[in-house]
Regions:
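Membrane-proximal helix-loop-helix interfaces that form the catalytic/acceptor-binding platform
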Residues: 2-509
Length: 510
């Protein structure tokens, strides 16, 4: 049965794997992994070393098999599927085979897991490492052995270099290990391993504090809205790529009710018997589910916003574990099984529509632009981030067309299409320098050589967002005003997360 569920996870992950366009962050995966090892390490160092192991893996695969979306996404599918049997081992060790199967099937059909399995980012690996580290911690607690705890420490070290939010899992894991372990030797070992782990992860901690990623992340401070989004996400609701529906709200309500029942069960057990083997599962699951979001909220309030659903995917397996533990205690057993089936119907109802929804449809936007382009056309990219995937798709389309496709010249600033090294140079260009290249005098120069200019924009901020988001938005408005000094708007085309505007010199004002 576990093999079948692992196969189900692989099938759900590989289904239509390449049909959804790469989105902004996946473009950065391609951009980074396409560099040499020295370049990858330098980029990772500037961002707290997070994703370094992941980028190196994708770098090897690109070298072997090319840079298609399938190649870059396949490792995430496999990582997410690998978490499924580990979830069974964890839940079965805590509460028996039936609960193990419940937790396994719930995780396998979790929409957020499947969605991020189909992304060329590290989030599925975070789920795998979260489950693996928790399993090692449980074995160490139950067996009173230091060997599994050493494994736990090593997994957490790799996890922190994969994504720094894995640090949020340390506190709930150590809290449970201290409270539920009856071995003084294990507790002393935990303290020692924590000190060693802190030294191993010191580069992550120091760079994360000073990294520009955390200083310029365009996230607002946490609030009720973002908390609801994260709660829906952890309940395996949609919302990342598709609008939240009544099904998502129902799924959140059911999951929340089961979690509350779990809290009541744990409280009663602790009053009657204290921390023991029988309630370890609920104690661990609830701490794993609740504490990382709470800690993330507090960190975000300190000025380093990271209160975002996908950053907390490390707690996603905990929801499946808690639900399985609660349903496993329901009597008669048929009632618990009915509850599982009822919940799975909602999860499949959320999962099915999410396959067709891209986060950013760079693929279609770029293809349509190139299909409509004429000789003498130019294109300007509204932000350096959007340039990455425009170059990725335009270069691939040009290769497949065998030179028969018109490639507009990139202007404001001028750039060469398709080279990851060139794109990286623009991606690192400060916003102020980028805006200077789009001032009226440079637009005037472009007007002498461009009959039409396509404005390609994505993630250009918001007038009501964070300070960084507002800065990007004002930059876009300035660019549009400058273009209209010499060109007349001739069309607007909107896609998921991407917009393309056409400006025509032959129909300029006056």
């Amino acid at each position: 049965m576990v093999v079948a569920l692992t196969g189900l996870s692989l099938g759900l992950g590989f289904y239509h794997l390449s049909s959804r366009s790469l989105w902004l962050d996946e473009g950065y995966t391609w951009l980074t992994a396409a560099q040499n090892v020295k370049g990858i390490t330098a980029i990772a160092a500037s961002q707290g070393y997070h994703l370094l192991p992941y980028y190196l893996l994708i770098h090897v695969l690109i070298g072997w098999f090319g840079d298609s979306a399938f190649v870059m996404r396949a490792p995430s599918v496999i990582a997410g599927a690998a978490a499924v049997p580990l979830m069974y081992l964890l839940a079965a060790r805590l509460a028996g085979r039936r609960v193990g199967l419940y937790a396994t099937v719930l995780l396998a059909v979790s929409q957020p897991l499947v969605f991020w399995q189909q992304n060329a980012r590290d989030y599925a690996f975070v789920v795998l490492l979260a489950v693996a580290s928790t399993l090692a911690a449980v074995v160490g607690i139950q067996d009173g052995s230091l060997g599994p705890l050493i494994g736990w420490a090593l997994i957490m070290a790799v996890g922190c270099y994969t994504h720094p939010e894995m640090l949020l899992l340390v506190i709930p894991q150590e809290l449970v290990m201290f409270l539920w372990s009856g071995s003084r030797r294990v507790r002393v070992g935990i303290v020692g391993l924590t000190m060693v782990g802190a030294l191993l992860n010191l580069p992550v901690l120091l760079n994360a504090v000073h990294s520009s990623v955390y200083q310029t992340t365009p996230l607002l401070p946490p609030g009720v809205g973002s908390a609801t989004e994260i709660a829906t996400f952890l309940a395996s609701g949609a919302g990342t790529a598709v609008p939240v529906t009544a099904t998502d709200h129902a799924l959140l309500g059911i999951t929340f009710a089961l979690a509350v029942i779990g809290v009541a069960m744990l409280g009663a057990d602790l009053v009657d018997r204290g921390c023991n083997r029988s309630n370890l599962g609920l104690g661990l699951g609830l701490a794993w589910l609740v504490l990382p979001p709470v800690i993330s909220w507090l960190v975000s309030e300190s000025g380093h916003p990271d209160f975002l659903d996908r950053y907390l995917i490390l707690s996603l397996p905990a929801a499946s574990l808690v639900i399985a533990l609660v349903l496993g205690r329901v009597q008669p057993r048929s009632l618990g099984l009915f509850g599982l089936v009822y919940l799975l119907i909602f999860r499949f109802g959320v999962l099915a529509p999410s396959y067709s929804a891209p986060l950013d449809d760079f693929s279609t936007a770029t293809a349509d632009l190139l299909a409509a382009a004429r000789p003498g056309d130019c294109v300007t990219i509204a932000s350096n981030q959007a340039r990455t995937l425009y170059d990725y798709y335009s270069a691939r389309l040009a290769r497949s067309a065998g030179g028969r496709l018109t490639q507009p010249v990139q202007v404001l600033p001028f750039a060469v299409n398709g080279s990851p090294q060139v794109v990286l140079a623009f991606n690192d260009l400060p916003l102020g320098d980028y805006r200077n290249a789009q001032q009226p005098q440079f637009v005037a120069q472009a007007a002498t050589g461009c009959r039409r200019i396509w404005l390609f924009q994505s993630h250009v901020g918001s007038p009501t967002g964070s300070a960084t988001s507002q800065l990007f938005y004002r930059s876009l408005l300035t660019l549009e005003r400058n273009l209209q000094l010499y060109f007349r708007p001739a069309g607007q085309f909107n896609y998921h997360g991407v917009a393309v505007s056409l400006f025509d010199r032959d129909r300029r004002p006056g």
